[in-house]
């Protein structure tokens, strides 16, 4: 599906949970880092056209997960290409969403 065809109906909370579950699965594999990098780079982080059309609750779930759980995984530092920006953004999101 092209990103320009994305719609609110395509990305729901169950779809997000599948992405996050897949990210956790890949993180646990010894050979999963390249696929996790692709998932992060092309779906979870660098493609705002996907997430801008989703309901606010789905966006909140994604950013809460990113600021609370995802940033603590062992392979995160070697997986994400724009680590400085992501960590900085997650720190801001943590303050905004979680109050600390």
Curated annotation (Swiss-Prot):
Q: Quick check: keyword Cell membrane in the entry?
A: no
What UniProt keywords are attached to this protein's entry? Chromosomal rearrangement
Q: Which InterPro entries match?
A: NBEA/BDCP_DUF4704
Q: Which residues cross the membrane?
A: none
Q: In which tissues is it expressed?
A: Expressed in prostate and testis.
Which Pfam families does the UniProt record give? Answer: DUF4704
Linked disorder reads: A chromosomal aberration involving BCL8 has been observed in diffuse large cell lymphoma (DLCL). Translocation t(14;15)(q32;q11-q13). The BCL8/IgH translocation leaves the coding region of BCL8 intact, but may have pathogenic effects due to alterations in the expression level of BCL8.
Name of the molecule in the record: Putative protein BCL8
């Amino acid at each position: 599906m092209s990103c320009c065809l994305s719609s609110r109906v395509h990305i729901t909370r169950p779809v997000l949970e599948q992405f996050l579950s897949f990210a956790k699965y890949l993180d646990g594999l010894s050979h999963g880092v390249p696929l996790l990098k692709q998932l992060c780079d092309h779906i979870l982080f660098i493609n705002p056209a996907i997430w801008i059309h989703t309901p606010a609750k789905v966006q909140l779930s994604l950013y809460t997960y990113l600021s609370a759980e995802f940033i603590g995984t062992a392979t995160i530092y070697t997986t994400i290409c724009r680590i400085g920006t992501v960590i900085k953004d997650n720190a801001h999101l943590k303050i905004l969403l979680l109050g600390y």
